[in-house]
Amino acid sequence: MSADSLFWPIFFAQYYSALESIAVVVAVLIMISSFDDLFIDAWYWTREIIRKFRFRNDDNYRPLTPEQIKEREEQHLAIMVPAWLEYDVIAQMIESMVATLDYRNYTVFVGTYVNDHRTIEEVERMRRRYKQLRRVEVPHDGPTCKADCLNWVIQAIFLHEQQAGIEFAGVILHDSEDVLHPLELKFFNYLLPRKDMIQLPVASLEREWYELVAGVYMDEFAEWHAKDLVVRESVTGTVPSAGVGTCFSRRALLALAATTDNQPFNTESLTEDYDVGNRLAAMGMKSIFAVFPVDFVTRGRRWFGLGPDLERVIRMPLCVREFFPDTFRT
């Protein structure tokens, strides 16, 4: 048999052997990178099983109920919303928030930039409608980092306290796309001032089955906020802020401001949410990733769009909901 006739069999044999070697290397790398997932799953489910049996056999254990959090006297709470070019959503967000929240003793502070005239107009329109709304002007052009806007909002909150003769027990961070649950402020009010940072889970609003990019975000956030953060809090005792649905106690904000020239949020960091969580942990502040089951009303279309929309009541943790991005560019 000539050498030419053996070329292709030898070539394909070597090619197949190389593919096998590459597959082994890739499999080993995937296995190594999956160890953390295996640890998280093992810790999470072991913890859940232990808690289930412990609390089931504890006659003194009573789950927290919505009625309990509603009974607590309302403290002053502030909501801060940084806004840059949010003119198309900010009014709807404010209207939805005011109509939804089952709470009276709160003030909303929206931070806008001097060169963002369309957002300013929308916020001013809402301010004339709702007495609990304040607009905070960042005195320089935007955009800047989120931390910069938040620091100006915090200064306005401190000034408002002096002028109104009140003290906010907690300050809650939200974005212009957030949809709140009616019991959110009641829940924060119940935990303050015992906890210094309270982080709620973040979940997506309903999406269609074919919105695949948004579906990837939904999967990632579901895994991160339903399991990973629970394990992280259990193992390390620290909780990072998610940038939305985060409540800071007055004590926490004053402590943060005291260490950074009266600017609680670090403008040198692009991940101010992680930064603030780590700084509070270093100060010995008490943080919690709060999981409190409540009822949500969801609406969705029927298969093939036939018939009226479906409305269901589902039980899931109290969370902040929003539409996650649905394009590759975002």
Predicted regions and their residues:
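Internal catalytic domains of large membrane-associated glycosyltransferases
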Residues: F53-G305, D309-L318, F324
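Short hydrophobic helices that act as membrane-entry/anchoring signals
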Residues: S5, P9, A13-Y16, S33, ...
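N-terminal membrane-anchoring/stem segments of glycan-assembly enzymes
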Residues: M1-K70
